[in-house]
Amino acid sequence: MLEVRSVAKRFGPVVALDRVSFQVRPGELVGFLGPNGAGKTTAMRAIMQLVALDEGVVTWNGAPVDDAARLRFGYMPAERGMYPRMAVRDHLTYYARLSGLDAAAAARAADGWLERLGLAERAGDTVQSLSSGNQQRVQLALALLGEPDLLVLDEPFSGLDPVAVDTLSEVLMEQVERGAAVLLSSHQLDLVADLCSAVVIVDRGRVVLRGEVDDLRAASPVRHLEVEFASPTAWSPDGMGPRPPARRHRLELPAGTAVEQLLGSARAAGEVVAHRYGPPDLSEVFRHAVGRPVDEAPAPSDAEAGSGVGRR
C-alpha cells in the first residue's frame, strides 16, 4: 500500500504541499484532482523521490520508499522525458533493462506493450517523429514495463484521441484487476468518475476532500433537478425567478428539498416528458470543494507572484 503521510514542501516562500496525507491500496484506482497549481505534480514527484520533502514521509507497504521500492513503481510524468532520436522499441527495451528485466524479458515486454497500445507499426520510428498522442502512448508504455506494483500517472489522458482514451482506460482497469495500486491525475472529471473508485482533491497544497466517489456525491449538500419539456418552455420555479424558454432546465437545490412542488409548477408551465433528481456529478463536487473549475488556477499571493515558482 502507498501511504503519503503529512508531507510538506516549500519552494522559497511558496507552500507547494501543506501536510498532505492519503493512501492508495493494491487493486485501487484513485483519482488525484485539483485545479492548476494545486500541488498534484509536486506530490507525485515526491512519491517517486524526485523531490526532497521538508516534512512527512512516503511509504510503500509500511516502509519508507527507497530505490528498491521504486523499481516496482511505474511513473508517467506530465512532461515527456524521452530521448527524441531513439527508436520507440529501443526506448522501451532500454527502460525495461533499467527496471531490472533481462534482455529477453525486456524485448518481450516492449513488444507486448507496443502491440497492446497500437504502436507496433511505429516500433522503428524515432520518438520525435511521432505525434503528441503517440508520444503519450510511448510514455505510458514506459510506465507499464515490468508489471509495476504502483502506477503514478500525471495527466495520462492529455492529448489522446477518443480511441486512445478507451484503450488506456481498458489498460488501467486491467492493471487494477491484477492488483496494482494506481494513482492518476486528470482534468477530465467525467472520465475520472467512470474509472476511479476514490478521489483525493487538493487545493493550494492541501487536501480539501477525499473518499469514495459515490460517498462524496451522496454527502454533497446540493442536489440537481433536471426537467425536460416537450418543447422550449419558459418556467418560473417557486422562489427562483423566471427562466427563459428551453427544453431542459437544470436546478441546483439544497439536499432534502421537496421536489414535488417544483415538478408541479413545471407541469403547469408545459408538458414535462422526463425529469431526474439526484446528487451532483463529480465536477460539481469538485467545484463545491475548491470554489472554482478544475482548469482555473488560484490567484497568486504576493509571495507566489514574486517567487517565480508555482505549484503543479
Put a short name on every predicted segment.
Residues 140:
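Hydrophobic anchor residue at the start of the ABC signature
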Residues 169-254:
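ABC transporter nucleotide-binding domain
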Residues 93, 97, 105-122:
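Conserved ABC ATPase "signature" region
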Residues 222-292:
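Short, charged/small-residue-rich alpha-helical element at the C-terminal edge
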Residues 55-69:
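Conserved ABC transporter NBD signature motif
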Residues 151-155:
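Catalytic Walker B motif of ABC-type/P-loop ATPase nucleotide-binding domains
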